[in-house]
Amino acid sequence: MATKKKKKHQFPTAYTVIIIVLLLVQLLTFVIPAGNYATIAYDTSNKDFVVTRPSGKKYKEPATQATLKKHKVNIAVKKFKDGTIYKPVAIPNSYERINLKKSNLWQAINQFFTSQVQGIAQSVDIIAFVLILGGCIGVVHANGAINSGMQALSKKIKGKQVLLIILVMGLISLGGTTFGLAEETMAMYPILIPVFLLAGYDTMTVLGTIFLGTSIGTMISTINPFSTIIASNTAGVNFARALPLRITMWVICTVVGMIYVIRYAEKVRKDPTKSVVYDQYEEDREKYLNDADFNKPANFTWQQKLSLIIFGIAFIVMIWGVQQKGWYFTEISVVFLTAGYLMAIFSGLSEHKVVQAFVDGASDLLGVALTIGLARAVSIVMDDSHTSDTIMHFFSQQISGMSPLIFIWFLFIVYIILGFFIQSSSGLAVLSMPIMAPLANVVGIDRASVIDAYNWGLGFISLVAPTGLILMSLMMVNIDFNKWFKWCWKLLVIEFVLCLVALGVGLLVY
């Protein structure tokens, strides 16, 4: 009698993971009381402050330093007026529970589905970017530019594979620490995956190089305006004072990350069976290398060369625009859409083939686009239930009165927890800094340490939080979350210990 083959257990997909998190958050809203901090924001139209009470009632006050002092908001008024602080800032000691009727079963079910649709609607700028990017990549693939490029590159990278990891990871980490390069790296996966596979590596190496690069960079932010700068301004401290420690920490963590990736990558290059994703080895090579023979000499047409040049220029313009002009996804999408039109014109393909290639490319990234929208639903449920401020208030009550070292370590863990629910760096900064920064004065430490705990805690949880960038990145390389965690958990322990040590050092040097 034939024995039945045991069915292999499969880890849930990214969609299911997000839905599970969404359900858990929704269940928490039945337990966690609703509450708000009062907030203060600058009205650019009327040139005055608008104070919003926890009840939602609003009133105006003069846009002066005296108004901020009255509310114990330790921020220079010019930071509001020049647009540096553009979000409502929480007012310390203003938390109040609000009388918000808890949802019944039907309302909860309705919110569960509605929040997902709202999440997709609110993420339309990022979704448009992802789909347009996919379309552009489809056109580049269709005219053979990528395969020809890989053939030309195959001989040049031979024996220099490690430099590829160092260069890519170093530049991405630099972008993360200086101007918050994060979601924009989605554009790099389709281009770098074939390059890394050609070098003998696997898709986990690509994920480690790109995602760890941006995660470490944004975690150890030095002059990132979306985290360190806005947190420093909200806390009322000069960010430049803490730069030596933060730069040192960034270099150490980036080098540690590089060593971790390189050791694994070289092991895989020498023996592909050592790959964490070896079960999809053939599938990945067939999908990304298209069975091309890279031993043949490259047959590069001028149309293919021009397509790659246009695509490369689009990347350069994107990075310049984000860093120098403060562009967001609408402007970036326009850049790649323009590049798509130009590549279509010079691709050498017929109109029908160009359109089909664009649609096929966009459809390949549709799953990533939907994941982005679903992840936003978690934040929507938190906002609608008014539980974020309650969680913040609870932790602020727990950490007051501790010794300096225990305080800053515990605060780091608090930000890891808060970062799971609030992935927006600027949003978490303006919500938490007015509450947490004054506690540093009570304990007797510099507020710069609080900013480090915020940055490093949020960045640390971003490495594994389903509400962050990781699930979208995993979908780009077709890797399950459990494989990612199995691969990176040792690095997580190392980075966690490094953060604790650096926070302790910060107490001595600030």
For each feature predicted by the language model, list its residue ranges.
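Hydrophobic alpha-helical transmembrane segments of multi-pass integral membrane proteins
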Residues: 131, 160-191, 372-382, 398-438
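Short amphipathic alpha-helical coupling elements at transmembrane boundaries
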Residues: 118, 148-158, 194-198, 353-364, ...
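Hydrophobic core segments of alpha-helical transmembrane domains in multi-pass membrane transport
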Residues: 15-31, 130-138, 171-175, 217, ...
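Membrane-core helix-loop-helix motifs of multi-pass transport proteins
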Residues: 2-17, 189-279, 298-301, 305, ...
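Core transmembrane alpha-helical segments of multi-pass membrane transporters/permeases
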Residues: 14-23, 51-147, 327-390
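Short helix-coil transition sites and intra-membrane helix breaks within transmembrane domains
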Residues: 122-126, 137-147, 176-187, 217-224, ...
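Long, contiguous bundles of hydrophobic transmembrane helices that form the permeation core
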Residues: 2-15, 36-56, 244-357, 477-483, ...
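Alpha-helical transmembrane segments of multi-pass membrane proteins
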Residues: 130, 161-176, 201-216, 251, ...
